[in-house]
Amino acid sequence: MNRFKVSKFRHTEARQPRREAWIGDIRAGTAPSCGNHIKASCSLIAFNSDHPGVLGIVPLESQGEDKRQVTHLGCHSDLVTDLDFSPFDDFLLATASADRTVKLWRLPLSGQALPSGPGLLLGPEDAQVEVLQFHPTADGVLLSAAGRAVKVWDATKQQPLTELATHGDLVQGAAWSRDGALLGTTCKDKQLRIFDPRAKPEAAQSTPAHENSRDGRLVWTGTQEYLVSTGFNQMREREVKLWDTRLFSAALTSLTLDTSPRSLVPLLDPDSGLLVLAGKGENQLYCYEAAPQQPALSPVTQCLLESVLRGAALVPRRALAVMGCEVLRVLQLSDTAIVPISYHVPRKTVEFHEDLFPDTAGCVPASDPHAWWAGSDQQVQRVSLHPARRAHPSFTSCLAPPAELTPATAQPAGTPEGFSSTPSSLTSPSTPSSLGPSLTSTSGIGTSPSQRSLQSLLGPSSKFRHAQGSVLHRDSHITNLKGLNLTTPGESDGFCANQLRVAVPLLSSGGQVAVLELRKPGRLPDTALPTLQNGVAVTDLAWDPFDPHRLAVAGEDARIRLWRVPPDGLQEVLTMPEAVLTGHTEKIYSLRFHPLAADVLASSSYDLTVRIWDLKVGAEQLRLQGHRDQIFGLAWSPDGQQLATVCKDGRLRIYEPRGSPEPLQEGPGPEGARGARVVWVCDGHYLLVSGFDSRSERQLLLYSAKALAGGPSAVLGLDVAPSTLLPSYDPDTGLVLLTGKGDTRVFLYELLPGAPFFLECNSFTSPDPHKGFILLPKTECDVREVEFARCLRLRQTSLEPVAFRLPRVRKEFFQDDVFPDTTVSWEPALSAEAWLGGANGTPRLLSLQPPGMTPVSQAPREAPARRAPSSVYLEEKSDQQKKEELLSAMVAKLGNREDPLPQDSFEGVDEDEWD
């Protein structure tokens, strides 16, 4: 072979379909396992749902314009760790679980009820089953890996044919060669092993694969001597290696990608040699061509995904659109949808291209377990993919013969099986998985055909799920911002705003802070702005909620400066603050004003204390202790009686400042030490903490404020990014907006005081990263346009208002279900002296109903339109219809005339007459 031969796949394009072609309204979940979390046959797709032990089942192709219906199959009493479809029977599914068993299921045709029990049960094993794969040539043979053991099963007898020699550590991956003769494994002991299971249980070959013991995978190429492995090197960089089993001491070639902590999922099509690499928790697919003969791993294309990938699978080659030159199709599993991503080779003609689509393995097995174990190496007959020459043989495995299925009845709670549901179109939005101790196993859940039972199974949906965020018109922007300080500490929001103005730290020396008037949008002058000069670098700043003209600024000199901005705005440079608070001995982290008491301010510092100040007196009144490391964030409870902190020492604390300087409660916080934030939610009954896990994945943790020691009630993993998510909570709607500095996406979740705790809503995405994102007071919202949140987005050179609205049909009515009475947050409920003396206040409430608008709850019901019988529409025609028919007839009559045209009778002139 010419090593410089040009590849026919060099122009391959990855195409993402429009959202209408996505399989939406799903609730996907991921388990801590080595599986891919989604698999496909030529007819069905199976994927992990957010209920432990439950799979979602959906047809691969839609029938006409009907929406694909998602059903749910309760498989196990614990997490489903891996799954696989038979290569010969599209409706035979095998599942592996953390309950240490393997089950085989006969799935019905679309429209029929799912089975209430498995067709076969294998196991139990000594550990949770991590890997599962059917044999490529023999029906009824499959391998499973659990702990350090790998078994090859004769499923017809429900007995293992052999158990391979024990590995040195956890088996992370296992795969059959294409001819079914060999079996390869990757292990946490960093060894890559090749077995001939029919010859001996010991490894025929073994070699060090990847220098790091993190998650490793392998897949075989179309040529049985070659395989591809993925893993990590000693520098924690992700790498891909191509191996030849005949020269197994070293890899033929290797490829280093990046230092992402996410393991790579290799998806290889043996016929084309195209290799797709997908990282869980990422939003990008890499496509390479594996060419063992050269040898090389040649890059083909990259695809940037619209959502985070939770799992990935290849669609069988027999299900591809060959006339459209679709050479590969990847199914991306995200939290809320399954996205089919097609890889096409551009060709000028619409025809079947033999060079792109060689014959592929058919769906009729070559042997059975007995014949294969006896030594048969007969291969599966290959079939043409040409639509005109394609045979359509059908094969039904004997492992789980089809039976006459009847709708399953609800099973009593506690049974390991019995989870079934009739097909129904899921219209509620997906809710991310909450992996906290409050979510128990769903193995005993039963369903009835009623929609109410289905909704109770799937959980509630948020009325804000269709929220729409949009940047307001440019006339409301403040532009030409220059010299912003983008290096404020991670504990600070970066800027602050109230209903009148915005305070933004500048990069210039002297700790300067610019104050911009929101009522005066437009382009700022090119000349220097009047500023507040603090003399030292600014670490945090906050507006007094009860005095819109007072700004508190914390500096690196451990001092807090209080500035008073004139009512008409800052007209000149101010160098003398109204007051200076001293007491901290180290740099200050953050500032938080009391939500109800006037002149009360809390501050945290590198001296590991939280101090509470009486601004009227200008002195420290209370000091909170007990922190052993950096304080990431603090927050007052809505009633102002308690204060919560989250710390780098991995602890979450609640204080009663007026009662004791020591914490009232302590509990485990986020595992990661990169940063965290805390906010009180659900009327002060819960604490929401945003932070990182041990793998640097951003996550949300929800704690009961009365039981911190018990750990989080729910945990939600989001994505991998370096910046801490900054939460902005709206107590009126129960919505939290989350984004980080440098992000382009704002997450929206509705928080519930019970399971499922998190209800996902539409997120807001911007084309470029923002430097800060702050929620404005509720009174800034345009209630008539059903605007439930107004925010400010800080960009590199501008400040933009962002409105979040809810689509409603009858906007002429006041949407009282969206706008309850709101707290008058700009009026104090008591003084600092009263609060420090032990008194508690209650805030006043204010209705947001505009004058002259009627609440939608009191709106008269619209009478349904009377519909005429269909015969009326068939027999009667309107005047407009009659006119259109007459014009069409006239045009048709004129168009059918074949008389010669006038210009046809004209005679031309000789060429010499033109001179």
From Swiss-Prot:
The keyword Ubl conjugation applies. It is found in: Golgi apparatus membrane; Golgi apparatus, trans-Golgi network; Cytoplasmic vesicle; Cytoplasm, Cytosol. There is a cross-link at K463 (Glycyl lysine isopeptide (Lys-Gly) (interchain with G-Cter in ubiquitin)). WD repeats lie at residues 75-115, 124-163, 166-205, 209-253, 533-573, 583-623, 626-665, 719-759. Residues 396-456, 850-915 are annotated as: Disordered. InterPro entries: Coronin, DUF1899, Quinoprotein_ADH-like_sf, WD40/YVTN_repeat-like_dom_sf, WD40_repeat_CS, WD40_rpt. GO terms for biological process: actin filament polymerization; Golgi to endosome transport; protein transport. Residues 874-886 have a biased composition (Basic and acidic residues). GO terms for molecular function: actin binding. Residues 399-413, 420-450, 859-869 have a biased composition (Low complexity). The modification Phosphoserine is found at S453, S456, S905. The membrane-associated form is phosphorylated on tyrosine residues. Keywords: Actin-binding, Cytoplasm, Cytoplasmic vesicle, Golgi apparatus, Isopeptide bond, Membrane, Phosphoprotein, Protein transport, Repeat, Transport, Ubl conjugation, WD repeat. GO terms for cellular component: cytoplasmic vesicle; cytosol; Golgi membrane; trans-Golgi network. The keyword Ubl conjugation applies. Belongs to the WD repeat coronin family. F-actin regulator involved in anterograde Golgi to endosome transport: upon ubiquitination via 'Lys-33'-linked ubiquitin chains by the BCR(KLHL20) E3 ubiquitin ligase complex, interacts with EPS15 and localizes to the trans-Golgi network, where it promotes actin polymerization, thereby facilitating post-Golgi trafficking. May play a role in the maintenance of the Golgi apparatus morphology. Interacts with clathrin adapter AP1 complex. This interaction takes place at Golgi membranes and not AP1-positive endosomal membranes. Interacts (when ubiquitinated at Lys-463) with EPS15. PANTHER family: CORONIN, CORONIN-7. This is Coronin-7.
